[in-house]
Amino acid sequence: MKRTIIMMLDSFGVGASADAASFGDVGSDTFGHIAKACAEGKADIGREGPLKLPNLARLGLGHAAMESTGAFAPGFGDNVELIGAYGHAQELSSGKDTPSGHWEMAGVPVLFEWGYFSEHQNSFPKELTDKILARAGLDGFLGNCHASGTTILEELGEEHMRSGKPIFYTSADSVFQIACHEETFGLDNLYRLCEITREELEPYNIGRVIARPFDGTGPSDFARTGNRKDYSLEPPAKTVLDKLKEAGGEVVSVGKIADIYAYCGITKKVKANGLEALFDATLAEVKSAGDNTIVFTNFVDFDSHYGHRRDVAGYAKGLEYFDARLPEMLALLGEDDLLILTADHGCDPTWQGTDHTREYVPVLAFGAGLKAGSLGRRKSFADIGQSIASHFKLEPMAYGESFL
């Protein structure tokens, strides 16, 4: 029985990539800087001491990062019995955003330029927002700027609840984000507003519209809920997910995977929110998955809760939780199963600002006859998609080289 399990640690980069200068990210290193902060006692909130990831280390994380940066991260070294194949991958796509990383790892790099709202204030064209408001029957909106999703709730959440005006904001990514209170504005109303916005954005080539529902009564307790929804463009070509589905296989999305691929190539969607629930759901799906199945999980908390919020201790604690549960996953794997752990970009919690960082990502692979050892530097995330195509004996992808 052949299956592939992809555990995507959203934003878990392993060092600045060769083209990081083009993104202002030279010196960024999500994994390395977290390990350094832990070793120096600077990440002892909710946890303490050096970063402890023994299971990821056995799968080759420390070695993959060493090959990426030229040095082992603090607390990691050669004194580990490797069981997995490890490498690090360069992104071929033009951006450091979520859709680009995900589509590329499924065999379809983004070789065009996304549209962006680059102005930090008055970010959106009036012509665009006028059309959105008219179609939605709204008399105004708040925000219209680059912002941290949590900060903008503190600043504008109460005014939003009083006025009923949605909060529009963006970032360095190709994204249009809309924050609304689940009770006073309504979740269905927010989703409908996002659908309208997605349609009106067609000429702008924006990668995603994101619904950002929140609850609470004031700045001290406003919090995003688990009902986020992404409205992505469809990938520009068939991914390996599409090809497996067309061949009669199953593709199970856990978390936000289905949204990122605009449901293309997905046969089942499982909703889960938070690291624990995402891990539980992944294990449950692997237990029930049959032959020719991909189980694909995005562990979004690493990015949304820790990377963007520049929470080093939280990121470290999350990694240690994930690592402690990995043996549960390994115990479920059959001889012909392929387990892949990777990331879609970096989001160094020690870096300036709140945006993603252009980094190499780890490629940790286990099973399917792979021998423990180095896979080297992969020229594209698409090597993952090509390897999955090879694993299932599908038609080769146009991009990528298999490491199987």
UniProtKB/Swiss-Prot annotation:
Function: Isomerase that catalyzes the conversion of deoxy-ribose 1-phosphate (dRib-1-P) and ribose 1-phosphate (Rib-1-P) to deoxy-ribose 5-phosphate (dRib-5-P) and ribose 5-phosphate (Rib-5-P), respectively.
UniProt cross-references to PANTHER family, sorted A to Z: PHOSPHOPENTOMUTASE
Alphabetized SUPFAM superfamilies for the sequence: Alkaline phosphatase-like (SSF53649), DeoB insert domain-like (SSF143856)
A Pfam entry, by short name: Metalloenzyme
Family: Belongs to the phosphopentomutase family.
An example molecular function term from Gene Ontology annotations: manganese ion binding
Protein name (Swiss-Prot/TrEMBL): Phosphopentomutase
Highest classification ranks of the organism: Bacteria, Pseudomonadati, Pseudomonadota, Gammaproteobacteria, Alteromonadales
Pathway: Carbohydrate degradation; 2-deoxy-D-ribose 1-phosphate degradation; D-glyceraldehyde 3-phosphate and acetaldehyde from 2-deoxy-alpha-D-ribose 1-phosphate: step 1/2
GO cellular component: cytosol
Catalytic activity from the UniProt record: 2-deoxy-alpha-D-ribose 1-phosphate = 2-deoxy-D-ribose 5-phosphate; alpha-D-ribose 1-phosphate = D-ribose 5-phosphate
Keywords, in A-Z order: Cytoplasm, Isomerase, Manganese, Metal-binding
Binding site for Mn(2+) 1: D10, D344, H345
Cofactor stoichiometry and binding remark: Binds 2 manganese ions.
BP term (GO), one: nucleotide metabolic process
Entries under InterPro entries matching the protein: Alkaline_phosphatase_core_sf (IPR017850), DeoB (IPR010045), Metalloenzyme (IPR006124), Phosphopentomutase_DeoB_cap_sf (IPR024052)
